[in-house]
Curated annotation (Swiss-Prot):
Entry-linked SUPFAM superfamilies: L30e-like
Keywords: Ribonucleoprotein, Ribosomal protein
High-level lineage: Eukaryota, Sar, Alveolata, Ciliophora, Intramacronucleata
Name this polypeptide is given: Large ribosomal subunit protein eL8
Pfam annotation, one family: Ribosomal_L7Ae
Keyword Ribosomal protein: yes
Domain of life: Eukaryota
Amino acid sequence: MPKAPKKITKPKKAEKKKNPLFQAKPRSFRVGGDIQPKRDLTRFVRWPRYITLQRQKRVLLQRLKVPPQIHQFTKTLDKNQSSNLFKLLASYAPEKPAEKKQRLVAQAEAKKDGKQVETKKPIVLKYGLNHITTLIENKQAKLVVIAHDVDPIELVIFLPQLCRKNDVPFAFVKGKAALGKLVNKKTATAVALTEVRNEDKAKLQQFSELFKTNYNANDELRKTWGGGILGQKSQHKVEALAKAVQEEQIKKAKL
């Protein structure tokens, strides 16, 4: 008799060992399920230390009452005025080391050839707090520009009053780094112009009048206190308390 055919057996697949630490969790794709809408999580970000300090300082200056002498530093020139001012100041930036080397080499070669070398004192921006203070006291400065974010503020807090006393036009601009860039430094507390070229005298006069109107002769700037703004939570508490008092008064009036 013929033998019965052998049963075809499928080879058993080796079961993969599953790690018990990783468990399958089915996701719900409904509204408000596992996939949440994007939210602004700025408040919960762990910022770098220096940014945290910047944020805390900003909030503190809003909460506390800030004296006018410090608060006036927040009243900077607007974007249009400051851009025009920086264009003028950039044309009087001191020479860079490479430019100085090139100039000295050219002078040395001219001297070697027996040519007469003319050396005129260049008209450049003045910087350095002590130097600017001396220029203001001697009434040599025609225009003074002060950075609004000097830290500690005590370094320059006397400059505005000194400028008013000596009738020197001054203004606050955003960024000690921007002023530093003009004089080839990382930062600068203030810069000053003592003289300008003939073609820029009209611009200097224009800026002098603007600064005197907005800063030197502006008495509100010297009297206005800053800060004293409550936070969102405190504002809600004050409103709730005022509402409760109002309701209590209405009840008493009805009695």
